[in-house]
Design a protein with these regions (language model features):
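Active-site cores that bind ATP or allylic diphosphates and position pyrophosphate for catalysis
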Residues: 1-84, 88-212
Length: 212
C-alpha cells in the first residue's frame, strides 16, 4: 500500500485539476488516502446480468477471430453512451473495406445515468448487424467498463483493450472519451503521434467528423 497525491494523479491522468471535470471530482470525492497494489486473484467471476449470454473474454475472441473465422485483420470499436448513428456507420463501413472483421464493444457500465438504456443500445447494434452489416464479418460483445473521461489517454487505454481482445486495428473517432470542453475534438488523435504501432501492438485508424 502507498499514499498518493490527488492533484498529481488528476493532472497526469486527466490533464487538469479542475474539480468540474467528473474524473477529477471522482478522485477527490470517491478515492481514499491510501492506494494498494500487487498481484490480482480472481475469486468469483461477476455475473453481467442481461449481458452475460453475450459476454466474450479475450480467449473467446482470439479463438473466434483467428481459428474459427480465419481472419487476418480485425478492427475494434469501443463505443459509449451514444446510440448507434450514421457517424458510427461511416467508421464501421470504412473499416470493413480495409480489414477482414469488425469487433464492436458497446460499454455497458457507464459512470452516469444515460437517456438510452444499455440493453436498447445493444439491441440496436444487434438489429443492424443482423439486417444491414455483413453478418459473418461483424462481431458484437458488451464491454463492462466505464468511461473515466480521460480523453486522449483513455483513447490509448481503449486501443490497448482492443489489442488484448485480439484486434489488429483500433478505430478512433473525434472527441473519443471526451467530456465538455476539456479536450479539443481531435486530442484523441494527436496523442497517438507519441507512439508507434509497435509500441502499442496495434494499428490505429483515425476518423474525422463527417456530415451529409
Amino acid at each position: 500500500k502507498f499514499a498518493y497525491d490527488r492533484e498529481f494523479r488528476a493532472y497526469h491522468l486527466f490533464g487538469t485539476t479542475d474539480r468540474s471535470h467528473p474524473g477529477v471530482d471522482a478522485i477527490y470525492r470517491r478515492m481514499g488516502d491510501i492506494a494498494i497494489g500487487g498481484p490480482i486473484w480472481l475469486i468469483n467471476r461477476a455475473n453481467w446480468g442481461p449481458f452475460e449470454k453475450m459476454r466474450m473474454e479475450p480467449k473467446d475472441t482470439w479463438k473466434l477471430f483467428y481459428e474459427e473465422k480465419k481472419f487476418k485483420t480485425v478492427a475494434g470499436f469501443i463505443t459509449g453512451a451514444n446510440p448507434l448513428h450514421r457517424g458510427h456507420e461511416y467508421i464501421h463501413r470504412n473499416a470493413l473495406e480495409k480489414v477482414d472483421g469488425l469487433f464492436i464493444q458497446p460499454l455497458v457500465e457507464l459512470a452516469k445515468r444515460e437517456y438510452t438504456r444499455h440493453e436498447f443500445r445493444m439491441l440496436a447494434y444487434r438489429s443492424v448487424i443482423d439486417t444491414y452489416y455483413p453478418k459473418e464479418r461483424t462481431i458484437l460483445a458488451p464491454l463492462r467498463v466505464t468511461y473515466i473521461f480521460a480523453g486522449p489517454r483513455e483513447a490509448v487505454l481503449h486501443a490497448i483493450i482492443m489489442k488484448n481482445f485480439g484486434c489488429t486495428h483500433a478505430l478512433i473517432g473525434r472527441d473519443h472519451a471526451g467530456v465538455g470542453d476539456f479536450y479539443h475534438k481531435y486530442a484523441a488523435h494527436e496523442i497517438f503521434d507519441q507512439f508507434t504501432p509497435q509500441e502499442l501492438g496495434i494499428d490505429v485508424m483515425l476518423f474525422h467528423e463527417v456530415s451529409y
